[in-house]
Regions:
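Acidic catalytic motifs of isoprenoid enzymes
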Residues: 1-173, 182-200, 214-223, 240-243, ...
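Short alpha-helical scaffolding segments that buttress acidic/His motifs in well-ordered protein cores
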Residues: 178-181, 202, 269-273
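Membrane-embedded alpha-helical segments that form the functional core of polytopic membrane enzymes
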Residues: 198-208
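Conserved beta-strand-loop-short alpha-helix elements that form
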Residues: 208-214
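Intrinsically disordered, low-complexity Pro/Gly-rich regions
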Residues: 288-337
Length: 337
């Protein structure tokens, strides 16, 4: 399973852990329902954010959950799982982006994909995922051609990139794809006024996804001779870190403009966990599973109880369920940790 937002469940409050798992399992089951058992392989942590965003804006309803049967990944327990348009959009996006990842590995001739028969089979699978994602996207009013076009442009940009090419030129297609996916959640939730700030949050999330993937793969790519945006453009890690920190700040600013019915899980994933993803990629954080002992990672502070879902009420703004408003004491107050 892949994705940059990979929270350790010990850091989530019990309620948020259940919610997060509901969206993760909901994505997996939406893939199976619409595209067959094999499609579940593309289940990923970042895709479920699309489902989380949709529900956070529309509000959770009893119709938005169903009880799933036993699953080995849940120790054969039943569980409530998310269903509906948010989960289906997450499935469509996950299929298209997984297709892009497969084609990227084929282009790099990674492992067995260096063999022509295996590469040909992988290309057929990727093409099938593109078509499947397009069908589901169309049923939801989302044109996955935006994602496919971005993926296709990526190859051309990488071919032309070299020393001195701005790194953000290379990340632009990914930014465009994730901006479109995030923005469409506003339309599914019936909150079109949220589309613009969510597009901005999605654009910066895509930038982070691309940069963190490059940072984490840098040494392996150098050893195998695979293309890496940092190496190709001559970008030092310090500049990549600066761009990541700027993007983190931009995501928070964009989410302040979004009207959520309940933004707690969004806040945990896109404020706290996204910061931890950056720290992890750059080797500036660790993860402790000791109960009752908070620790500091980067700029994030783990609460003493081992969770950091916002407590009852709203620590950042007056609107219930909206953790991105001005901090207590007005705009001049220090930012939350």
């Amino acid at each position: 399973m892949f994705g940059i937002v990979r929270p350790c469940t010990h850091r989530l409050s019990e309620g948020l852990r259940v919610e997060w798992m509901a969206h993760l399992c909901g994505l997996c089951l939406a893939l199976r329902a619409d595209h067959g058992q094999f499609a579940r392989i593309v289940t990923n942590y970042d895709g479920l954010i699309v489902s989380v965003l949709t529900e956070a804006q529309a509000g959770r309803t009893p119709e938005g959950r169903r009880t799933a049967g036993p699953c080995p990944l849940r120790a054969m327990r039943t569980a409530p799982v998310a269903k509906g348009e948010g989960a289906r959009l997450a499935a469509a996006v996950s299929l298209v982006l997984a297709s892009a990842k497969v084609r990227d590995h084929v282009a790099d001739r990674d492992g067995l994909l260096a063999r022509r028969p295996v590469a040909a089979a992988a290309r057929r699978v990727a093409a099938g995922w593109d078509r499947a994602g397009a069908r589901t996207g169309a049923a939801l009013g989302f044109d996955t051609a935006l994602l496919v076009d971005a993926v296709d442009r990526q190859t051309g940009i990488e071919t032309l990139a070299g020393p001195g090419t701005p790194l953000l030129t290379v990340t632009e297609p990914t930014e465009t794809a994730t901006a479109a996916a995030f923005a469409h959640t506003a339309h599914l939730a019936g909150k079109p006024q949220n589309a613009a700030p969510l597009a901005e949050a999605g654009r910066l999330f895509g930038r982070l996804a691309h940069l963190l993937d490059a940072v984490e793969d840098r040494e392996a790519d150098a050893a195998s001779g695979a293309w890496n945006p940092l190496t190709a453009t001559g970008t030092p890690l310090s500049e990549a870190r600066r761009l990541c920190d700027d993007a983190l700040h931009g995501v928070r600013l964009a989410l302040r403009e979004v009207e959520f019915a309940d933004g707690k899980l969004v806040h945990v994933l896109l404020a706290h966990e996204l910061r931890r993803s950056v720290d992890r990629a750059f080797g500036t954080s660790s993860c402790s599973h000791q109960e009752g002992q908070g620790h500091q990672e980067g700029r994030g502070l783990l609460l003493p109880d081992g969770s950091f879902g916002p407590q009852p009420g709203n620590p950042y703004g007056p609107q219930p369920g909206h953790p991105y408003g001005p901090p207590p004491g007005g705009p001049a107050a220090p930012p939350p940790p």
